[in-house]
A protein has these predicted regions:
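Typically the conserved alpha-helix immediately C-terminal to a functionally engaged Cys/Sec
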Residues: 35-48
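Short pre-active-site segment immediately N-terminal to redox-active cysteine/selenocysteine motifs
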Residues: 19-22, 26-30, 73
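A short beta-strand-turn-helix
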Residues: 1-22
Length: 110
């Protein structure tokens, strides 16, 4: 899984217009639900490798990004399509629900 540090300049303003949709996982190391979500996020990254970028954002280490994204609770997931549109999901999700969201993003990307 790639580290969000690489993408900080790219993510400013959420003007993503890349060739691949993105799932951003805003988390904290001390957050129980975030820890529970991690295996599902890692599985999603492996299953959709090459078709979907999955990035993790530690809100304590990336406060400017978390503040800009108005993250008020963790985990918060951003599902970003290739046009840069963001669908926000607060709270942990079961893997099957994550997979449905990922399939929709990848399918819309063509």
């Amino acid at each position: 899984m790639e580290n969000v540090q690489t993408y900080l300049p790219y993510l400013r303003g959420y003007d993503y217009t890349g060739k691949m949709p993105v799932v951003l996982d805003f988390y904290a190391t001390w957050c129980g639900p975030c820890k529970a979500l991690t295996p599902s996020i890692e599985r999603l990254a492996k299953e959709f490798e090459g078709r979907l970028k999955v990035l993790k954002v530690d809100v304590d280490k990336n406060e400017p990004l978390a503040r800009a994204a108005a993250i008020r609770s963790v985990p918060t997931l951003f599902f970003i399509d290739i046009d840069g549109n963001i669908e926000r999901q607060m709270g942990a999700m079961p893997y099957d629900a994550l997979r449905v969201k990922a399939e929709a993003l990848v399918g819309a990307a063509g």
